[in-house]
Amino acid sequence: MPKIIAFDQEAREAIRRGVSKLARTVKVTLGPKGRNVILQKSFGSPTVTKDGVTVAKEIELEDPYENMGASMVREVASKTSDVAGDGTTTATVMAEAIFNEGLKAVVAGVNPIQMKSGIETAVSDITEQLHSMAVKVKDQEAMANVATIASNNDREIGTLLADAMSKVGKDGVITVDEGKSLQTEQEWVEGMQFDRGYLSPYFVTDSTSMEVVLEDAYVLVFEKKISNIKDMVPLLEKVVQQGKPLLIIAEDVDGEALATLVINRLRGTFTVCAVKAPGYGDRRKAMMEDIAILTGGQAIFEALGVKLESVDLPQLGRAKKIIVDKDNTTVIEGGGKSADIKARIDQIRREIELSTSDYDREKLEERLAKLAGGVAKVNVGAATESEMKEKKARVEDALHATRAAVEEGILPGGGVALLRASGKVKAADTLTDDQLVGYNIVLRACRAPLTMISENAGQDGGIVCEKVLAMKGNEGYNALTDVYEDLVKSGVIDPTKVTRTALGNAASVATLLLTSDALVAEKPEKSGKAGHGGDHDMY
């Protein structure tokens, strides 16, 4: 495939155009008075969003050189979103500001490598300053404020998420699902719940709610299908002697085995319920082991040389209460040893750290929460599918941001933290002239987020920046109410992690672009005229 190459000024100019196109599209969404962007979809209704990373991911430019610049900045937005969950638009605005300032300096003859070193020093100094300004999140109100800001000033989402976070704690899992009603609701699932219901409605013990409720029950976890009741008879006899109910979790229970269990249940011989094992493949094995550890039993795997007919009561798990409906099974207060459960949780944590796939990480986090004792579910409600998609994305962003706030503390929002931090740092005397240029570029770029927030709110960005600089501490410009006030008190706050990540990622990509001097792209193919249809070319 032939390539096309651009050098020096031509290359930098092409990158600048690409960066500018992407940044201009994303910038309009910044701040409480930011505008929406409408994205065309190849099928279905267009998506209306105010989420920076969603907009950035959609942008592909026709010119291959411009597209390179745009996709590098797109990387800033998605990396910031992955790590901190919010701050994607701030990162894009910062990247453009650093790149544009740096480009002027490079054209004027500054050495890009020296300048890069100065930029990195400034980022490191400002990050240190941000950490020293950070305040720990102590109460639910502060969490609600963080979530409200991250969900584009939706107070309902903020309060819901803060409530959920306070229930599940720092390590707990909160899942975001599409709800069935117009309201966004939150539900709390205690104990370990998995999405498998009873195999026969004849197991039901409470006919009004159509649930099986087993108190102080035994739990059998078996990896294979159970079709023949003969293998189970010795175990069932021992359970009947104890007078306790039994939950069977297996790949499947069918045929004669299921029929015998149902008949004994209907006759009142003993209370029993059978459900399929959760998950698929290797994940199913891992989840079965989780259930066994939680209930203090042993997962019966034939690969380990344990046969079903030789299973004894000590190998069964125990649980204080088990509730099974047609879709879900919930095990409450399993009888597992806390040391074993803790060891299993630590093992899953290590797997999460090593995991490279987002999907695997999400599933591992779910398993972790189920072992740790509960999951909070947020069911997002909306009137239309388009609104549902947009709202769900906002809830997920807000969730990430709230987690980040609990982790590293909070700062005043509205672009003020960066402005304050940049005003407090000073370049060391040891820097060379070119490094000093890079250092000062970052200090000037720290004004960009506040300038953009003000301009989206219909104010003059330069004037607002100067007014805020003259103030002290957490005081700044609240674009939502158009008032200068203490931002932390009025709930305009950003997680430290979000601000720090946005600055770091923006500087990283901007310096990469500034130190690049040639672009190599594939030559676009010229497509010839389309052939005639029909039998035109027969004559």
Swiss-Prot record:
The lineage of its organism: Bacteria, Pseudomonadati, Planctomycetota, Planctomycetia, Pirellulales. It comes from Rhodopirellula baltica (strain DSM 10527 / NCIMB 13988 / SH1). Its main location: cytoplasm. Forms a cylinder of 14 subunits composed of two heptameric rings stacked back-to-back. Interacts with the co-chaperonin GroES. It holds the Pfam family Cpn60_TCP1. ATP binds at residues 29-32, 50, 86-90, 414, 478-480, 494. This is Chaperonin GroEL 3. It is found in: Cytoplasm. It is an enzyme of class 5 (isomerase). Belongs to the chaperonin (HSP60) family.
